[in-house]
From Swiss-Prot:
Residues 266-278, 429-440, 459-480, 536-546, 555-570, 631-642, 709-728, 784-806, 844-869 have a biased composition (Basic and acidic residues). It comes from Homo sapiens (Human). Residues 46-61, 245-256 have a biased composition (Polar residues). Disulfide bonds: none annotated. InterPro entries: CRACD-like, DUF4592. This is CRACD-like protein. Residues 38-102, 131-174, 212-871 are annotated as: Disordered. Residues 224-244 have a biased composition (Basic residues). Pfam families: DUF4592. The modification Phosphoserine is found at S92, S490. Keywords: Phosphoprotein. Residues 407-425, 503-521 have a biased composition (Low complexity).
Length: 962
């Protein structure tokens, strides 16, 4: 506006200096306008006043055009040289876009005007009449008014097809021009210029205000183009690409987000929009995850950013309104009524969270505990939000431990908002949960997230309610542990909470994909899981940069189920906003999401396992050794139990009880892996995601087309499939879901995306189970006695495996579980490669059951030993395990069809026992033997063996490089 006003002043000065000198300059500079200038001189002699007045009106219009966008003046001198120059150039630009037919039509009118102009009075009268006509009815009178103006104006306007700009400008300037003419008619150019200045002063702002709407025609040349050229347009393009699939879900979610809520929170949206814009800027820098087109990178620069901001603002407004209306009040009716909306909104809230913190503090009231727990890791983010949250948390966090964490949490308002969002979803899940939240101010915080995943289904919500009640005891313990740990390592304590939440979130996503079939249920679990995941990124600040992508990836599949692109954006913005220092992780997330959001969850396990292998050995041990041993050990069992129960809850309430204890054991290891996986998943994620996303998407489709077990065999091609199937024959199919979440937790929350991706499609579930089979049996061990025989041996295995997972989670977490395959990443990659070729192997899978047993003991032995081995050895074992893993897939494939599910379970149990006893001895011998047997006896062609070796080498390469 200021620049446009300055231009207006300059134009006015030019209008004042509209002398013959300016016309002479025009002649020298613009030969094309010489004729028009000559006509101008002639017209000026008969009616200099009229021409000047019309020129001024043109200048006004031109000024408006200039304001709308750069008209292309080479210098201010040209502007000052003459309004004619300005008009000519502005019209010249318009002429480029506007046919000259209008000019021709106006010329005859101009001729009449010239004749009439012979008398200045007549000319002015005609002009005034035209202006009056144009002013009141600008659209209809615009053309005639333009003609009248052209008649009044010098031939410059005649030459240029200025009618279109005048149309819109006249609409804006119509009354002003009339005033100008009235003032100018008696006076000369100086008076007209003065009047023009006055009218410009009044009109320039008017034109500016009207420009957004009216400038569309005029601004198409300049301002509109610039706007389109700005980042938003690129963001829109990339976003359109990413959101092509999201658009529908987002539009639905945005539609679900009532405009009323958006209106109610327009102010918060305004607040959010600035922060979202920075976050979107970061995202834009990321080019949306570049891939996604960047976490935010994929987000189209301007258009996409604007659309995204608008969507995010809508979603954030909805989330803010939902949280404000729902969380503080915890209106179960509103949230349950709009669980999908509320949770998609909650996801957006995560996005908006930096701006939404003002909203969040009222919302977090019940969420304060969670937010405080989550916030400490994100400490640097938002002290302001945490202040409000502290106020809110004080009542909510009856348990003071989180208040202690609150100071740290003060730095992490974004994450606090995520917590609020997650709690809002949980509150949305039902007032019952919110009641446990309040009753157990801090303990329910984790349960809330846990509840959030189970909450997707109303029944799971009830189960989750029971879970919070169950976990109430454990969570109070958590609280006790957290408070004690929170004062000194309060960020680690929230980290552990975040870890647990990511586990719950991953489980929630895992549950949400299956629930995705149920449509609304996945939406609800998604937000909780998203929040948990969002909290997960917060766990360690160091991890944040890496963790947010993992959380975002986890959230991406869930959000796909919920909102699709909208929630993904929320995750992006949440990651960016929660950790504005995490623009990179946010970027990587969108990249992964862009590649394939659900596939990201699918591939997420792969790259997470790889990242877990790398990070767990390197980072997770020290970091988790601090918060992990204390809080993971304390909270790990409890939180994992609650989480396992909550993910299982949506699927199977009995298994919630079973999974809760089982998961508790694996939870510490799982918790440690999760951050590491979140940390390094980006490069690995991107690599594995492109392949694994396609591969897993195809696998899920195949599973849909093919029987679940056959698809599982193909997907896993390892005994893990058999254990999965074994669990299913035991009649624990729902338990499998529940145990999967626990096993995923025990395995390492590095795989939470896997549960998410694996749960929606049946085959994916087997994959998760197969990878986590040793841990999964253990959750059953702690839980119901259905699988006690399996559970007992596998529990023993799980514990050493968990230890190994803590030290070298890649083998344990990546391993099918009992097999302890450390190479799920390469296995997934090789599976992707093999799937095309190994769709044949299902026959081979039937062949060597004994080999599978051998490979399982050997690999299981590997896992315990790895747990014992130092991190370096774990890394070395990784390469070996990756080399060995092909054996299991081949053997498992062969066995998959032959072995019955029960037989497979029995073998798995026996193998687990054998593995425990033989792990040390079998390690290297069986590794080599299994390698040989798997390559030689898999009945696979040599090219398959080579492919395996190559895939293993490639999978090992990133680790070695790292």
């Amino acid at each position: 506006m200021i620049s446009t006003r300055v231009m207006d002043i300059k134009l006015r000065e030019a209008a004042e200096g509209l002398g013959e000198d300016s016309t002479g300059k025009k002649k020298s500079k613009f030969k094309t306008f010489k004729k028009f200038f000559g006509k101008k001189k002639r017209k000026e002699s008969p009616s200099s006043t009229g021409s000047s007045t019309w020129k001024q009106s043109q200048t006004r219009n031109e000024v408006i055009a200039i304001e709308s966008g750069p008209v292309g003046y080479d210098s201010e001198d040209e502007l000052e040289e003459s309004r004619g120059t300005l008009g000519s150039r502005a019209l010249s630009h318009d002429s480029i876009f506007i046919p000259e037919s209008g000019q021709d039509a106006t010329r005859p009118v101009r001729v009449f005007s010239q004749e009439n102009v012979c008398d200045r009075i007549k000319a002015l009268q005609l002009k005034i009449q035209c202006n009056v006509k144009m002013g009141p009815p600008p659209p209809p009178g615009g053309l005639p008014a333009k003609r009248g103006e052209d008649a009044g104006m010098s031939s410059e306007d005649d030459g240029l097809p200025r009618s279109p700009p005048e149309m819109s400008l006249l609409h804006d300037v119509g009354p002003g021009t009339t005033i100008k003419v009235s003032v100018v008619s008696p006076d000369h150019v100086s008076d007209s210029t003065v009047s023009a200045r006055i009218s410009d002063n009044s009109l320039a702002p008017v034109a500016d205000f009207s420009y957004p709407a009216e400038s569309s025609s005029c601004l198409d040349n300049s301002a509109a183009k610039h706007k389109l050229q700005v980042k938003p347009r690129n963001q829109r393009s990339s976003k359109m690409r990413r959101l092509s699939s999201r658009a529908q879900s987002e539009s639905l979610s945005d539609l679900t987000c009532t405009p009323e809520e958006e209106e109610n929170e327009e102010k918060p949206l305004l607040e959010v929009s600035p922060e979202e814009r920075p976050s979107s800027g970061q995202q834009d820098v990321a080019p949306d995850r570049g891939p996604e087109p960047g976490p935010p990178a994929p987000l189209p620069p301007p258009g996409g950013a604007r659309a995204r901001r608008a969507r995010l603002q809508h979603s954030s407004a909805l989330t803010a309104s939902v949280e404000e209306g729902g969380v503080p009040g915890e209106d179960p009716s509103s949230r349950p009524a709009t669980p999908e909306l509320a949770e998609p909104e909650s996801a957006p809230t995560l996005r908006v969270e930096p701006p939404s913190p003002p909203e969040g503090p009222p919302n977090p009231g019940p969420d304060g505990g969670k937010q405080d727990g989550e916030a400490p890791p994100a400490g640097p983010c938002a002290p302001a939000t945490d202040k409000a949250e502290e106020v809110v948390c004080a009542p909510e966090d009856v348990a003071s431990p989180f208040p202690t964490a609150i100071p740290e949490g003060d730095t992490t308002p974004p994450e606090t908002d995520p917590a609020a969002t997650s709690e809002a979803p949980s509150a949305r899940d039902g007032p019952e949960r919110s009641v446990p939240k309040e009753a157990e101010p801090t303990p329910p915080v984790l349960p809330d997230e846990e509840k959030g995943p189970p909450g997707p289904a109303p029944e799971p919500e009830r189960e989750a309610e029971t879970e919070p009640e169950r976990g109430a005891g454990t969570e109070p313990e958590r609280i006790g542990t957290e408070p004690s740990t929170a004062p000194a390592p309060s960020p680690p304590a929230p980290k552990s909470c975040l870890k647990h939440r990511p586990a719950a979130a991953s489980e929630g996503p895992a549950a949400s994909p299956p629930l995705a079939a149920a449509e609304s249920p996945p939406v609800e679990p998604g937000p909780g899981s998203l929040d948990a995941e969002a909290a997960a990124p917060e766990r360690p600040k160091a991890e944040r940069a890496e963790a947010p992508p993992a959380g975002a990836e986890r959230a991406a599949p869930e959000r796909k189920a919920e909102r699709g692109g909208a929630e993904l954006r929320g995750a992006k913005k949440f990651s960016v906003s929660s950790c504005r220092a995490r623009p990179r992780p946010g970027v990587s997330r969108p990249l992964e999401r862009a590649s394939g959001r659900l596939p990201l969850a699918r591939s997420g396990p792969v790259w997470r396992s790889e990242a877990a292998l790398d990070d767990l050995q390197g980072l997770p041990e020290p970091q988790h050794a601090k918060p992990g041993p204390r809080k993971l050990a304390e909270r790990g069992p409890q939180d994992s139990g609650d989480r396992a129960a909550s993910p299982a809850g949506p699927r199977k309430s009995p298994q919630e009880a079973a999974a809760a204890p089982g998961t508790r054991e694996p939870c510490p290891a799982a918790q440690e892996p999760a951050p590491s996986e979140d940390r390094n998943p980006f490069p690995v994620k991107l690599r594995s995601t492109s392949l694994s996303l396609k591969y897993r998407d195809g696998a899920s489709q195949e599973v849909k087309g093919v029987k679940r077990y056959s698809a599982e065999v193909r997907l896993e091609r390892s005994l893990t499939v058999l254990p999965k199937e074994e669990k299913c024959p035991l009649g624990t199919a729902p338990a499998l879901r529940g145990t999967r979440a626990p096993s995923d937790q025990g395995k390492g929350k590095a795989r939470p995306p896997e549960p998410l991706s694996s749960k929606p499609p049946l085959p994916r579930k087997p994959l998760l189970q197969s990878f986590t089979l040793p841990h999964q049996p253990a959750p059953p061990d702690a839980g119901p006695g259905e699988r006690e025989p399996r559970k007992e041996p596998r529990t023993a295995e799980k514990r050493p495996l968990r230890r190994g997972a803590e030290k070298s989670l890649p083998p344990a977490a990546t391993g099918p579980g009992a097999d302890g395959q450390p190479a799920p990443p390469w296995i997934t990659v090789t599976r992707q490669k093999r799937r095309g070729t190994l769709d044949q192997p299902p026959n081979q899978e039937d062949k060597p059951g004994a080999r599978t047993l051998k490979s399982e003991p050997g690999k299981q032995a590997k896992v315990p030993e790895r747990g014992q081995e130092p991190v370096k050895q774990a890394d070395f074992v990784r390469s070996k395990s990756f080399l060995i893993t092909p054996v299991k897939p081949a053997v498992d494939r062969k066995q998959g069809a032959k072995l019955n599910f029960k037989e497979g379970l029995q073998r798995g149990i026996s193998l687990s026992h054998q593995n425990l006893a033989q792990s040390a001895v079998m390690m290297e011998k069986e590794l080599h033997q299994l390698k040989r047997a798997s390559y030689a006896s898999t009945d696979q062609p040599s090219w398959m063996e080579l492919a395996r070796k190559k895939s293993q080498a490639w999978s090992d390469m990133p680790q070695i490089i790292k």
